[in-house]
From Swiss-Prot:
One GO term of the biological process aspect: D-alanine biosynthetic process
Class in the EC hierarchy, top level: isomerase
Keyword rRNA-binding: no
Organism lineage string: Bacteria, Pseudomonadati, Pseudomonadota, Alphaproteobacteria, Hyphomicrobiales
Sorted UniProt keywords: Isomerase, Pyridoxal phosphate
Source organism per UniProt: Rhizobium meliloti (strain 1021) (Ensifer meliloti)
Reaction catalyzed: L-alanine = D-alanine
Residues modified as N6-(pyridoxal phosphate)lysine: K41
Name by which UniProt lists this protein: Alanine racemase
């Protein structure tokens, strides 16, 4: 039975934890001999790490990646014996958080390596990960720096990484030559760290095949139901559904206009549903389609789903409200108080993102605080 708050909310978000767990299991299986971690940064991609982490742990995940040491400290009580990796690494002043919470810093630079080694000299042994940049040019030691470290006879015995990793720049495009280039560079580095486990594949990398799996894969967006490979059928289950209440239904005569700037003109008598969702809720203004000047050259706008039919968004997304054309639905079927699915099982979040010229990651992590959130299922 749904709560009164769910039934009366202006907008609501339903997170299917069973689908989340199933997606992780599917990625773990696709990883073959490697084991799959789970990426939980940005509050589990906006869905709530307090709920997502226990579900993934119950499904079998034991390795977790987050962005910052603060995220790691918050995650620790949720996965007591999990290994938590911190992508941003260790900096002067936050060393104690790593030791207190048993967090694994990812070493991205020689400067961070120096901070880590100084911390070891004061506090004793602690695991770390060596991040090598193989072409992304964002974070990581260069392959040359990593190889020099591997062959340095003066390297302290206390420096013993538990993982060597890199990050693929073009894994969502299986045919991109950068994938093979990065794989080759990574193999050159891992050969110098004989016996140290290795990790290269993100979500898209898992789909590239066994050559990219090594010992640990790092699926992120795929676990949350998003597309990992451009142009391919997405095999993952939808995890999140966003719905918003119809506040009012209006009739606009043929030739009439609606929204800011009179940005949409109707060629027939039309019925328009005003819906309680806007860019303050992470429903980006750019999904308006041609109703926004800078979008004139981009695809048409997004759709919603109501009573078994897709209904087009019209006009401009505003802070709190959006308009959907419900003319093709029976008049008696659409009433104020009904809910339109904005994305979920029937409206793919990546399609909404494409309509806005962005990606599903950005929509998920932009979700505002006004949704009534409901978590269903589990591992």
């Amino acid at each position: 039975m749904q709560s009164p708050e769910f039934l009366s909310a202006s907008s609501r978000l339903t997170v299917d934890l069973t689908a989340l767990a199933d997606n992780w299991r599917a990625m773990n299986e696709r990883s073959g001999k490697a084991r799959a971690a789970a990426v939980l940064k940005a509050d589990a991609y906006g869905l709530g790490v307090v709920h997502a982490a226990p579900a993934l742990y119950a499904a079998g995940a034991r390795d977790f990646f987050v962005a910052s040491v603060e995220e790691g400290a918050d995650l620790r009580p949720l996965v007591p014996d999990g290994r938590i990796y911190i992508l941003a690494g260790m900096w002067p002043g936050n060393e104690e958080l790593f030791f207190e919470n048993d967090l694994v810093p990812i070493i991205n630079s020689e400067e961070q390596l120096a901070v880590f080694m100084a911390a070891l000299s004061e506090r004793g042994d602690h695991p770390c990960v060596l991040h090598v940049d193989t072409g992304m040019n964002r974070l990581g030691l260069s392959p040359e720096e990593a190889l020099a470290l591997a062959h340095d006879p003066a390297r302290p015995a206390s420096f013993s990484p538990v993982l060597v990793m890199s990050h693929l720049a073009c894994a969502d495009d299986p045919g991109h030559p950068m994938n093979r280039y990065q794989l080759q560079r990574f193999r050159e580095v891992t050969a110098a760290f004989e016996g140290v486990p290795a990790s290269l594949a993100n979500s898209g990398g898992v789909f590239l095949g066994a050559d990219y799996h090594f010992d640990l894969t790092r699926p992120g967006i795929a676990v949350y139901g998003g597309e990992a490979v451009n142009g391919a059928v997405n095999p993952m289950k939808a995890v999140v559904t966003a719905e918003a209440r119809i506040v009012q239904v209006r009739t606009v005569p043929s030739g009439g206009t609606a929204s800011y700037g009179a940005s949409v003109r109707f060629g027939r008598d039309s019925r328009i549903a005003t819906v309680a969702i806007g860019y303050a809720d992470g429903y980006h203004r750019s999904v308006s389609g041609g109703g926004v000047t800078l979008r004139q050259a981009m695809p048409s706008g997004a759709f919603g789903f109501l009573h078994g039919m897709k209904v087009p968004h019209v006009g401009r997304v505003t802070m709190d409200l959006s308009l959907f054309d419900v003319t093709d639905l029976p008049e008696a079927a659409v009433r104020a108080g009904d809910y339109i699915e904005v994305f979920g099982r029937n409206v793919v979040i990546d399609d909404v993102a494409r309509a806005g010229g962005t990606i599903g990651y950005e929509l998920l992590t932009s979700l505002g605080r006004r949704y009534h959130r409901t978590y269903v299922g589990g591992a």
